[in-house]
Amino acid sequence: MKKLILTLSLFALVLGAQAQSKSIAALKDRYKSNDDFFHMELGGNFMNFAEGFKIDLDKNDMATVAKSVEKLNFLTLPEGAPALAEYKTLQKGLERENYDLLMEASEGKSGVLIYGKGARTFSDLVILVGDEKEGDLIVVELKGSFTQEMLAKAKGQMN
């Protein structure tokens, strides 16, 4: 009986670790039947993927971040979708799911928001890019293990 309980607990833990944000899953379900909806999901060791395509990653900082990515979800809404409304709905949904706003950069009603879930180590990063002029919404969800120091180094490399 103990083995059964232990096995079920381990199984539930693994499923919980691989769970996608409910807000992002709802967005994906809303548009999955639309032919113009783009969704790409990559799993496994992201660094091996990057090396296979000869993507140049700085071996000291960006490579560490890339190796930490276990799963990547990339979504873009189809043209004509109410992108600004979806952008606001997704923001509220992520906040309800206890994601913390890590960074915000905006110009007018367009902008980039980065949300993280976790305390010292983040298990999930969500990047929202919304453009009111173009009516676009791009969502990037990264699952893995990201430390604050690692993200600070990666940000320094981008500047």
Indicate residue ranges for each PLM-predicted region.
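A recognition module on extended beta-rich or small alphabeta surfaces enriched in W/G with H and D/E
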Residues: 148-159
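A short, solvent-exposed beta-edge/loop patch
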Residues: 115-147
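N-terminal V-set
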Residues: 111-113
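Extracytoplasmic
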Residues: 34-37, 43, 67-69, 96, ...
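Early exported N-terminus immediately downstream of N-terminal targeting peptides
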Residues: 24-81
